């Protein structure tokens, strides 16, 4: 009988992954490191469900995420349910419907998986792991600056040094576009040209419109307004509309707070960044690590989201894509994420009670230990211990005897009293 050989990846739907122990340990390290930063900034955990009713969830989704939502019939009641493509709308719903009487602002953090439809191309994740925060009920530039400073501190806590946080402001774009009165197809074409930084294509589109020189200059400037803080001055020399100038003042105020936090060196500006136009209501930002073109985190202000669930409250936040973060930091996490275990305990012969008592005593003392239950040679056990990241091996003779302690790093040995270890009188 012929058996078909199956590649492990072919056993999974496209866009999802198994995470073996090494990668899983790194992901857990990333989660915990971010959680520690969130806690230092006084954010409390919240846990939304995996499934939502589609009609409820879609209130909080932009058009882009609606198209990426996995949906199916609930057999219990026939209603459409969905796997969430983003956690922020869930948090907005919970605060608006379950925490209406809670004091504001609410500082909430989360970690979870989301699912998104993607195009059929290799390497595109459909299952994404997010860790993020939402600051609900607080308006003003200091709140937005707090989000950016937190994101920077998260990256610093992971040992990253070469990274930037690119800041945009959707109100700046809206101010430039006000008054053009373009039909939807033309407006979309202009928006796409700006997002691509396609100055020649943008100029060609604008040539079909009857714009005065000042308005033409404002629109044409958008693909070029990116860089350091000097971008704000360049933009101020170009735009004359009040809406865009208010957006620039907002960015200056945010920058002043970031300078007080001492993190301004990581900040750049991109006033042609148009991500989330139908979702964000002010500042937006994305974090990029050196050498990686995909953002590891993104965030911004979304003052209208909770209102879609019945509670009008300003809000801002951000989320890390842990898979992108893992891809960027994989090599640097090797020593930090893979923590060794303390001791593996061996005992030959039919009576294993001494080894079992020793294992329990060591765990009670706070050590991470395991019994090597398989009967094999000492050398095979030592080889196994090294591969499984144990620091020591203990070889037990009998209930009353001594214990042979072997340090796997260098092979050095010493003999210690079993009773001393059981009594907690010996420390590894």
From Swiss-Prot:
According to its UniProt record, what is one Pfam family this protein matches?
tRNA-synt_His
**Pathway membership:** Amino-acid biosynthesis; L-histidine biosynthesis; L-histidine from 5-phospho-alpha-D-ribose 1-diphosphate: step 1/9
As for subcellular location, the record says: Cytoplasm
Q: Per its record, what are the GO molecular function terms? A: histidine-tRNA ligase activity
Which GO BP annotation is one of this protein's?
Answer: L-histidine biosynthetic process
- What cellular component terms from Gene Ontology apply here? cytoplasm
Q: Which family does it belong to?
A: Belongs to the class-II aminoacyl-tRNA synthetase family. HisZ subfamily.
Q: How does it assemble?
A: Heteromultimer composed of HisG and HisZ subunits.
Give additional notes from the record.
This function is generally fulfilled by the C-terminal part of HisG, which is missing in some bacteria such as this one.
Q: What is this protein called?
A: ATP phosphoribosyltransferase regulatory subunit
Organism of origin is Syntrophotalea carbinolica (strain DSM 2380 / NBRC 103641 / GraBd1)
The record's gene field reads hisZ
């Amino acid at each position: 009988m012929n058996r078909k050989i199956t590649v492990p990846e072919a056993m999974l739907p496209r866009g999802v992954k198994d995470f073996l122990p090494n990668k899983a340990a790194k992901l857990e390290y990333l989660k915990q490191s971010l959680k520690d930063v969130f806690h230092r900034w006084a954010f409390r955990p919240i846990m939304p469900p995996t499934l939502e009713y589609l009609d409820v969830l879609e209130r909080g989704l932009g058009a882009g995420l609606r198209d990426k939502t996995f949906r199916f019939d609930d057999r219990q009641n026939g209603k459409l349910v969905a796997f969430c493509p983003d956690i922020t709308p869930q948090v907005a719903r919970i605060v608006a419907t379950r925490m209406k009487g809670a004091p504001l602002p609410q500082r909430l953090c989360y970690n979870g998986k989301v699912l998104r439809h993607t195009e059929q191309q290799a390497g595109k994740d459909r299952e994404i792991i997010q860790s993020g925060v939402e600051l609900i009920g607080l308006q003003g530039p200091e709140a937005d600056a707090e989000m950016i400073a937190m994101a920077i501190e998260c990256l610093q806590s992971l040992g990253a040094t070469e990274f930037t946080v690119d800041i945009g402001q959707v109100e700046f774009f809206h101010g430039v576009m006000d008054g053009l009165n373009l039909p939807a197809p033309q407006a979309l074409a202009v928006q796409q040209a700006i997002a691509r930084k396609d100055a020649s294509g943008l100029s060609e589109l604008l040539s079909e419109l009857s714009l005065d020189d000042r308005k033409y200059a404002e629109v044409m400037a958008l693909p070029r307004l990116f860089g350091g803080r000097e971008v704000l001055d360049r933009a101020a020399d170009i735009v004359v509309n009040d809406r865009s100038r208010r957006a620039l003042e907002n960015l200056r105020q945010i920058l002043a707070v970031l300078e007080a936090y001492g993190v301004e060196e990581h900040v750049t500006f991109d006033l042609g960044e148009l991500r989330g136009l139908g979702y964000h209501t002010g500042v937006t930002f994305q974090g990029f690590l050196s050498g990686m073109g995909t953002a590891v985190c993104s965030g911004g202000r979304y003052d209208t989201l909770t209102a879609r669930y019945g509670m009008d409250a300003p809000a801002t936040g951000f989320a890390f894509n842990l898979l992108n973060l893992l891809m960027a930091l994989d090599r640097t996490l090797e020593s930090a994420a893979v923590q060794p275990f303390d001791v593996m305990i061996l005992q030959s012969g039919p009576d294993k009670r001494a080894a079992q008592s020793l294992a329990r005593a060591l765990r009670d003392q706070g050590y991470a230990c395991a019994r090597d239950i398989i009967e094999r040679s000492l050398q095979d056990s030592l080889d196994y211990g090294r591969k499984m990241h144990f620091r020591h091996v203990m070889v037990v003779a009998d209930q009353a005897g001594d214990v042979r302690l072997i340090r796997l790093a260098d092979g050095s040995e010493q003999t210690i009293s079993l009773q001393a270890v059981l009594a907690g009188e010996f420390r590894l």
